[in-house]
């Protein structure tokens, strides 16, 4: 008998799928921005966010002025070079993420954090709306100590704003230094540009991120 696997419980490393050594083939260019999905030009920076299904999350960020490129992928887990099917099984430890390459002279990391907090529900644990599983958990994966500090500060401010709005739930967003990022299959890249009527479960809770004091 195959044991039941609870997709709302994060797998540990010993029980994660083995994955593979070969990276996922990835298109050279983002079809929306016409910029590279893999290269980061001098002066630009990278952010990684998880807000549920990455289709809508990627569209949200490519719409922001100052965002150079975006890519859908997987991070936060153990399985190297996972497939979408493997991530959806809950046995990789990964969550669906979007890698955002941005120009800090046009849009700051703080502004990206505001987009993050105000456009999903960060207090749902291992789900986002009707999408249930560890791959839909909310997360901010930081690339620098400065990003880590800003992300932690923003979480505290948004928690206070939720409480002031009468929402007493605890934020479940994971804030942690980034583990390796793995590109999703090409079908998932810029999905809602290629499929304008496709599914998007993204939505905020009506709370705004207060400015830093």
UniProtKB/Swiss-Prot annotation:
Family membership noted in the UniProt record: Belongs to the MsrA Met sulfoxide reductase family.
Annotated disulfide bonds: none
InterPro entries membership: Met_Sox_Rdtase_MsrA_dom, Met_Sox_Rdtase_MsrA_sf, MsrA_MetSO_reductase
Protein name: Peptide methionine sulfoxide reductase MsrA
Pfam families: PMSR (PF01625)
Taxonomic path: Bacteria, Pseudomonadati, Pseudomonadota, Gammaproteobacteria, Enterobacterales
Known role: Has an important function as a repair enzyme for proteins that have been inactivated by oxidation. Catalyzes the reversible oxidation-reduction of methionine sulfoxide in proteins to methionine.
KW Repeat (keyword) present: no
Catalytic site positions: 53
Enzyme class: oxidoreductase
Species name: Serratia proteamaculans (strain 568)
Enzyme Commission (EC) number: 1.8.4.11
């Amino acid at each position: 008998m195959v044991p039941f696997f609870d997709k709302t419980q994060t797998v540990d490393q010993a029980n994660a799928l083995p994955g593979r050594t070969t990276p996922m083939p990835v298109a050279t260019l983002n079809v929306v921005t016409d910029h590279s999905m893999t290269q980061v030009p001098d002066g630009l920076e990278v952010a990684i966010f998880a807000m549920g299904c990455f289709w809508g999350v990627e569209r949200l960020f490519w719409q922001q002025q100052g965002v150079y490129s975006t890519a859908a992928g997987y991070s936060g887990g153990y399985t190297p070079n996972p497939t979408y099917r493997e991530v959806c099984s809950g046995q990789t430890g990964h969550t669906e993420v979007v890698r955002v390459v941005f120009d800090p002279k046009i849009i700051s990391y703080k502004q990206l954090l505001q987009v993050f907090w105000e456009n999903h529900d960060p207090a749902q644990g291992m789900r986002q709306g009707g999408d249930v599983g560890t791959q839909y958990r909310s997360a901010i994966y930081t690339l620098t100590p400065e990003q880590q500090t800003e992300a932690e500060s923003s979480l505290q401010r948004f928690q206070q704003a939720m409480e002031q709005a009468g929402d007493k739930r605890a934020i479940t967003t994971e804030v942690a230094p980034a583990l390796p990022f793995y590109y999703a299959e090409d079908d998932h890249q810029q999905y809602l540009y290629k499929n304008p009527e496709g599914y998007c479960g993204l939505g905020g809770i009506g709370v705004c991120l207060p400015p830093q004091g």
